[in-house]
Amino acid sequence: EFVFIQSKTNGQIKTYTGPIMVTISAQESMVVFNPKTKRFEETADFEKARQIFTSAPEGWYVVLKNPSIDGTHPDSAKAMNSPELQIGKKINISGPCSFSLFPGQMAKVVQGHKLRSNQYLIARVYDADAASKSVATIVDAEGKEVKAETEKYFVGQLLVIKGTEVSFYMPPTGIEVIANKDSYVRDAVTLERLEYAILKDEDGEKRYVHGPAVVFPKPTETFVNSPKGGVIFRALE
């Protein structure tokens, strides 16, 4: 566990990381960081002030906002001043890992993305330089871990990760997987013989795919709905 203590004289905030005995003077107060308002709020409730470590087991990863410039985390059993942070930056840290946060940092723990052959992910590049230097964790359809080839990315680029090629994926720093409602994994469309699907691109161009096939849309494509409902059309015999 850890807690933030702020000095009332100079406003400096220290991170107290357990195991440690905390004694609060009259010139100090406990504070908590509100991620919505991006402000520190004073509290006299120790149960509210103390926070648990950000922990990710094997096969999970942490999305950490505002990392320290040197990549360090608060030391255990110490009270530490906050180092200079990379405000506005975001990095991905693969598990297993466990650490407390510096004041102003925000973290989200995400399970690695498991894909069946008829599922896919859509990911977005938010930091092209970092994405080109980082390496994703990828397991292919045969269960073998593969090293992703370094690519040239551009900010805003959308990527489709197909379950026919990848069975497990954890994005490197610079790439984020886009959520689809309550899940990250999206279902492709499976076509049988005499069935087909129509995909419409942002430029109005249509693509027809005939079964049997598993159809993965491009990032800019959407399925055209059938008059009978759904996105699968039946060919005339």
Question: What do these predicted ranges mean?
Answer:
Residues 1-237:
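N-terminal hydrophobic membrane-entry segments
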